[in-house]
Amino acid sequence: MRAYNFCAGPAALPTAVLEKAQQELLDWQGKGLSIMEMSHRSADYVAVAEKAEADLRKLMNIPENYKVLFLQGGASLQFSAIPLNLLGKNNKADYIHTGIWSEKALKEAKRYGDINVVEAGIKVDGKFAISEQSEWNLSDDAAYVHYADNETIGGLQFAGVPDVKAPLVCDFSSSILSAPLDVSKFGLIYAGAQKNIGPAGLTIVIIRDDLLDQAKAEIPSILKYADQAKNGSMVNTPSTYAWYLSGLVFEWLLEQGGVDAIHKVNLEKAQLLYGYIDSSDFYNNPIAIPNRSIMNVPFTLADEALEKQFLKEAEENHLLNLAGHRSVGGMRASIYNAVPLEGVQALIRFMDDFAKRNG
């Protein structure tokens, strides 16, 4: 049987997608070869790539004045690529700091420009939260404002989209496609694929056309968004299999009814899990309710000494990858689009049984 996988990334993929990939692995659509063996310049592969982009545009209602790039190097490479591409004419940017991933982004950006750090992570009644925008010290002349919508490690998520004058740049790695989004509010959106899009090895960048000419002169051409846009994300050989698999995930999402439909399921999963944790004396979630992530749910046990036992027994019950990130400890259930409601129900049953036996 397939276990329920709560890994933060690389994360669960829909079973139907894996089955289709398995079916097509040796002989893609009667062509006598695997898509992994196919030239990225072939008409067949270009059609696969173009369909994946078209389906993503449909899922996210991406306006025509935005380019969609399928890149490599993970979201972490974009921590450098973004300032290199967007600070060519104005060397200043604002970075909103709410946790570990937004901190990694701003540390890289500081190597390339004058970065104003907006400290927005706060504590409210002992719980982690994000401060009101009225309290942020934003610059008047920033080239862009950067934030991470969902701090995957901390389980801290923005309750809405910040309203700023400068182009808004956002890391959506762990929340893309989980809820409806107005792409037109952003200058640039980026996301590593290995959480809600597909397997590791692919990074999506969605950039507004007017930002394609802002790059620093010395930027490597492989990192230059304008060059990638001009070459259909194929300045060099792309991650062909990851791109194909992501396309299958987009097809699957459309079959589920699109982002609106999957968002309803995601809310149900999150409400069930948080509801159980809040009703329990044995488990605790450290995040203020308005800023709780619907994708990454961290929690601690009443007795830290029981953590190893909890993880061992969870695995015996086919509930995998529930350990929190090494930097914060505790537990974390990542309940991305591909984690079914039944998986969350099974997790809650196990948590309840464990609490009764050890509380």
Curated annotation (Swiss-Prot):
Cystine bridges? none
Q: Which residues bind L-glutamate?
A: 41
Q: One Pfam family, short name please? A: Aminotran_5
| Entry EC number(s) | 2.6.1.52
Q: What is catalyzed by this enzyme? A: O-phospho-L-serine + 2-oxoglutarate = 3-phosphooxypyruvate + L-glutamate; 4-(phosphooxy)-L-threonine + 2-oxoglutarate = (R)-3-hydroxy-2-oxo-4-phosphooxybutanoate + L-glutamate
Q: What does this protein do?
A: Catalyzes the reversible conversion of 3-phosphohydroxypyruvate to phosphoserine and of 3-hydroxy-2-oxo-4-phosphonooxybutanoate to phosphohydroxythreonine.
- Family the entry assigns: Belongs to the class-V pyridoxal-phosphate-dependent aminotransferase family. SerC subfamily.
Subunit = Homodimer.
The identity of this protein, by name, is Phosphoserine aminotransferase
- Specify the species: Acinetobacter baumannii (strain ACICU)
